[in-house]
From Swiss-Prot:
Organism: Pseudomonas syringae pv. tomato (strain ATCC BAA-871 / DC3000)
Record carries keyword Cell inner membrane: yes
The protein's enzyme class: translocase
Lineage: Bacteria, Pseudomonadati, Pseudomonadota, Gammaproteobacteria, Pseudomonadales
InterPro entries: AAA+_ATPase, ABC_transporter-like_ATP-bd, ABC_transporter-like_CS, P-loop_NTPase, PstB-like
Name listed for the protein in its UniProt record: Phosphate import ATP-binding protein PstB 2
PROSITE patterns linked: ABC_TRANSPORTER_1, ABC_TRANSPORTER_2, PSTB
Length: 277
């Protein structure tokens, strides 16, 4: 069941004073970052990041290796909590609620904000059991409900026609591209509100990459999608908005077409034209 998505509590007028924060109406903001710094022990990885992630759009994070793209992405569902010594200063508001509030239910947060990693990671189970894994954890075991969820999620992930006759075969027998789409199906089966994709195509061949990119385009009508990519052509193809990061700082953030054709910062222009990075 999709929950009503509260948008209260966002101080949008104050955010507009920050250069990198999009001028968005309150109801169109999915994730608000009013100023986030992150540390691994004594090392600072993110420096006062401020941006708004638009609802039901695709936002790409680009930048050279080690610039903080994945660190920022993983902050949105607190995956960085799993790293020893990680410490956060600031806030991240998901539909107006600070996910770093003391006592936050992190398991529920990660259901609402699903994540797909660089390398496809299907479980050593059947295709069917991969898709229903999260539902079973929630205590949902009624066969009719699970069957409907499997069909819906696999169709949404553009995989149903390829696997509908072998749902009870091992997911490990799928191709890399099929496995990645299966992982996306597994993620959306629990009905998240946001999808985080950490270089989801870097291990895939060009044809599989195209299928995943087409899927991203289809899914944005229902989900807010944030993608980390080293491939600037991919960012230009799939995203509505793009953020360029460098050495843990947000250099520029805005409409993808504008950022690639008329960047406001020389540092951005140098990166997208291949002068460094």
């Amino acid at each position: 069941m999709q929950h009503e998505r509260p948008t209260h509590g966002m101080n949008i007028p104050a955010l507009r004073r920050r250069k990198q924060v999009l001028d968005l109406a309150e109801e169109t903001v999915a994730i608000e970052v009013p100023g986030l710094s992150l540390f691994y022990g004594d090392k600072q990885a993110l420096f006062d990041i401020a941006l708004n992630i638009p609802k039901q759009k695709v936002t790409s994070f680009i930048g050279p290796s080690g610039c903080g793209k994945s660190t920022l992405l993983r902050s949105f569902n607190r995956m960085n909590d799993l790293v020893d010594g990680c410490r956060v200063e600031g806030a991240i508001n998901l539909y107006g609620h600070n996910i770093y509030t003391k006592g936050e239910e992190v398991a529920e947060l990660r259901r609402r904000v699903g994540m797909v990693f660089q390398k496809p990671n299907p479980f050593p189970k059947t295709i069917y059991e991969n898709v229903v894994y999260g539902l079973r954890i929630q205590g949902i075991n009624k066969k009719r409900v699970l069957d409907e969820a499997v069909a819906w999620a696999l169709k949404a992930a553009a995989l149903w026609d390829e696997v509908k006759d072998r749902l009870h075969e091992s997911a490990l027998g799928l191709s890399g591209g099929q496995q990645q789409r299966l992982v996306i199906a597994r993620t959306i089966a629990v009905e998240p509100e946001v999808l985080l994709l950490d270089e989801p195509c870097s291990a895939l061949d060009p044809i599989s990459t195209l299928k995943v990119e087409e899927l991203i385009y289809e899914l944005k009508s229902k989900y807010t999608i944030v993608i980390v990519t080293h491939n600037m052509q991919q960012a230009a193809r799939v995203s509505d908005y793009t953020a360029f990061m460098y050495m843990g700082k947000l250099v520029e953030f805005g409409d993808t077409d504008t950022l690639f054709t008329n960047p406001a910062k020389k540092q951005t222009e140098d990166y997208i034209t291949g002068r460094y990075g």
